[in-house]
Amino acid sequence: MTLAAIGQICSTASIKGNLEQCVRLVGKAARGGAKVLFLPEASDYIATDAQASLDLAVAQSSSPFVLGLQEAAKTNGVAIHVGIHHRPVPAQVPDEKEDSKATAAGRILNRAIYIAADGRIDDSNTYDKLHVFDYGSLRESATVQPGSRLTAPFDSPVGRIGSLICFDLRFPEASLSLAQPGPPSRWHGRPAQLLTYPSAFTLRTGEAHWETLLRARAIETQSWVVAAAQVGRHNPKRASYGRSIAVDPWGKVAVRLKGVTDAEGSAEEGAVEEIGFFDVDLDEVDRVRREMPLLRRIDVYSEV
C-alpha cells in the first residue's frame, strides 16, 4: 500500500494566494508521509467573471502557479496532481489540436497536470477537460475550449492514473474507457487503476449528486476514485461544495473532507486547506476485478 493525500482549498482571483494555500498543503502531505497529493480543479484561480478568467490565464510553461508547485514538489519530494488553466501558445506547439482550437476561438483550456516528485512535468500526462459545464448562470463554454481526447493512463506511486475533471464525472463512458481492460491495443493493455476528478462542484449539484456519482464511478470501473474539491465562497458570485473524497474499488469511502454549512457557501471550520490521508491498495483493485469480472456483452451493445 502507498499513502496518498487529498487536499482542498478555496481559490480566488489571487494566484499568489492560491499558490500559498497549495504549497502549505504540499508541506502537510510531505510531513504526513504521502507520496502523491491530489488538489482541486482551477487551483490556480477562480475569477469573478468570464473576462477576468481569460485575463488571468497564462501558458502552463510560464505560469508562476505551476512553477511554484514544481518547486514545492521537488523540495518536499511529493508528486502533485492538480487542475489549472492554460492559455495556448500555438507557435510553440503547432501540433496540439486543443491549443489551436482554443486560440482560434479566443478561449483557454481547463487542464489537469501531474508534477512528479522531482518537479518535472511530462506533457504526455496532461489532460484537457472534455465536457464543459454550462448550468444556470455558469457558462464555462464562454471561456473554455473542450479537449478532444482522453489521456492514456500513466504510472505514479499510487498506480496508473486516469485523469478526468469535474463535469466529466457525469459521463461514465470516459471513466469506463480509461479503466476497463478492453483489447490489448487500448492503453497497451494497461488500464487505469485510479481515476481522478479534481472539481469545483456547485452547492446545488454537490448536495444532490457529488458522492453518489463518485461512488458509482468507483463501483462500475472497479477502480480507486479520487476527487479533490474546491470549498467555500470564492467571490460574491460563486461558492463550491467541498467534501473532497477518495473511494476504493468496492465503493467504500476511504476519506472524506469537510464542506459548506449553508446555502451561502460558508465553509465548515477547518475545511479550507484541509488535508486527508488514505492508503491506496492496488491489490484491492486486482482482487475486486478478479472476483467480480464485468464481462460486457459487446455482442449485444456497443463497446465503450
PLM regions with names:
Residues 1-5:
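Extreme N-terminal starter segment of soluble prokaryotic enzymes
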Residues 58-60, 71, 88-190, 198, ...:
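Active-site catalytic loop in hydrolytic enzyme cores
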